[in-house]
Design a protein with these regions (language model features):
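Extended active-site and interfacial segments that coordinate phosphate-rich ligands
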Residues: 36
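Long, structured ligand/cofactor-binding scaffold of large enzymes
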Residues: 1-4
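Ferredoxin-type iron-sulfur electron-transfer modules in oxidoreductases and energy-metabolism complexes
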Residues: 51
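Compositionally biased, low-complexity flexible segments
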Residues: 287-324
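Thiamine diphosphate
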Residues: 9-10, 14-16, 20-31, 39, ...
Length: 324
């Protein structure tokens, strides 16, 4: 708000955001909400690119708007902290990158009976790509993968179109970018993010049908990326199960297929909701019984019961406290 009030311009690169991309830093550096906090600031442009070509397009546009056009906007761009291969840019994708979403990898199966659309942003886009392969190879589901570079841009565009249409009833209605991208699609829609579920929910009203939202609601934890993503239910296997569940809900496949996938992937359907697992010492008064049980089970498995970095007994004197 201070930067907006001062009419600041510029680009801020966030190297540590994302709930699951920075290993071993627990609550303090596992940010799952900064993109949500960007929503109320009108002059802040917030992007979560997955690949170098997306980042280049966003920065180039940011320099044009702030330095050339002298527009009073500033940028928050999260690049997370995970190394992975950088692909080449799909032809004609730059407009979608700047407006918030584009189709990164089509399924390649135009006549498939079972269709799905997977949406990822930042490092979680790689989980969507892995889920695309699993769905195609094991379940004959043709899934297109979409990159969402900015939930805020999509939300602001959608609400702006809604406002115009409400106040200009006799003029041609405007169509939000989300709806333009998806107007000729069918199937089910699954969105996965390294941030809270409120982000994908914020644009769901402009989808052809209600999408399934996967996110990282809850406290940050100290573990490997793969274990964190399994715990927060945003890894490729959870994306596959969410897709199969949506197909079963509309009657396209039987529910036994979903149950079989849950068992095959080693997903515990009785695991506690991640947002209820506090991560404190067993027996803490502020933990529910289910959350304590989930923490103990996960610690025994070495998987998802990850203690936060500060989950340790502090000296009685108050000296030697963690200084992180």
């Amino acid at each position: 708000w201070a930067a907006g009030d001062m009419r600041s311009r510029g680009i801020k690169i966030g190297g540590t955001p994302g709930r699951t991309t920075l290993n071993g830093d627990g609550l303090q550096h596992q940010d799952g909400n900064s993109h949500r906090l960007a929503d109320p600031v009108p002059t802040l442009k917030a992007y979560d690119p997955a690949f170098a070509f997306e980042l280049a397009a966003i920065i180039k546009d940011g320099i044009r708007r702030t330095d050339v056009e002298q527009e009073d906007v500033f940028y928050y761009i999260t690049v997370e902290n995970e190394p992975y291969a950088m692909p080449s840019q799909p032809e004609g994708s730059e407009e979608g990158i700047l407006r918030g979403m584009y189709r990164f990898r089509p399924s390649g199966s135009e006549n498939a009976e079972l269709r799905a659309h997977l949406f990822g942003s930042g490092a979680i886009l790689n989980e969507a790509l892995r889920a695309q392969e699993i769905l195609g190879e094991r379940y004959n589901v043709a899934a297109d993968v979409w990159s969402i570079t900015s939930y805020k841009e999509l939300y602001m565009d959608g609400t702006d179109c809604d406002r115009f249409n409400r106040l200009h009833r006799d003029e041609e209605h405007r169509t939000p970018w989300v709806r333009q991208c998806l107007e000729d699609t069918d199937g089910v829609y699954v969105m996965a993010t390294d941030y809270v579920k409120a982000l994908p929910h914020s644009i769901g009203k402009w989808f052809p049908k209600q999408p399934v939202a996967l996110g990282t609601d809850g406290f940050g934890r100290s573990e490997s990326r793969s274990a964190l993503r399994r715990f927060f239910e945003v890894d490729a296997e959870h994306i596959v199960v969410a897709t199969l569940g949506a197909l079963a809900a509309q009657g396209s496949i039987d529910r036994e297929t979903v149950a079989s996938a849950i068992a095959e992937f080693g997903i515990d359907p009785e695991a506690p909701n991640p947002v209820t697992v506090r991560g404190g010492r067993d027996g803490d008064d502020d933990q529910s019984a289910g959350a304590r049980r989930g923490s103990r089970q996960c610690r025994r498995r070495g998987g998802a019961g990850f203690r936060r970095r500060h989950d340790r007994r502090k000296p009685e004197s108050g000296r030697g406290r963690d200084r992180k």
